[in-house]
Amino acid sequence: VLIMPGIGYTVDRPLLYWAAQALAADGWFVDRLDLKLTEDVEFPEMIACMERVVDQWRAEALEHAAESGEEARLLVVTKSLSTLSYPHSAKLGLRVVLLTPVLNPPPFDKHKSIIPAPLPGAVGSPMPLICAGDADPYFDDAKAHLLTDHVRTFAGANHSIEVPDDWRTSLDYLKQVTQAIVD
């Protein structure tokens, strides 16, 4: 599994950290793309970089599987900015988790980058799992349902799938997201 970060949301933040822990406990080999991204990143350049990372990771995982005689288990877990690499992963036929996908453009991205919905050329690729909060300004439930039937929306949750001033609900959501990824 390849774990990919978002802007200000590194792989050691709760959603990605616990996804990695749960998947490792479930027998997955976990690779993490450890980037420190800020709002001044050039979205098209970063998306292209992430697509190259996916290509390299996929090639290495397939090579390892062939050498070991094991079946390749390929899954990409993305968060926020890295969800914009989904169209590329879908074309490769990869299973993908989209945590807080960018379906509405962030105001700081002059390129207005979003995941197109519906996604052209995704026929035949596995439907992604989408998890997001309904208080996330970059999430759009209708667009999400154009991409997949596997949409988990969390009431009152923000772009981190957390509910401000409600740690109990935030932890419950974290558990639900982690479980959905493992399932």
Language-model region placement:
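Primarily recognizes the serine-hydrolase "nucleophile elbow" in alpha/beta-hydrolase
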Residues: 54-127
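Serine-hydrolase catalytic machinery in alpha/beta-hydrolase-like enzymes
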Residues: 1-71, 163
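Conserved alpha/beta-hydrolase "acid-adjacent" motif
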Residues: 107, 137-143
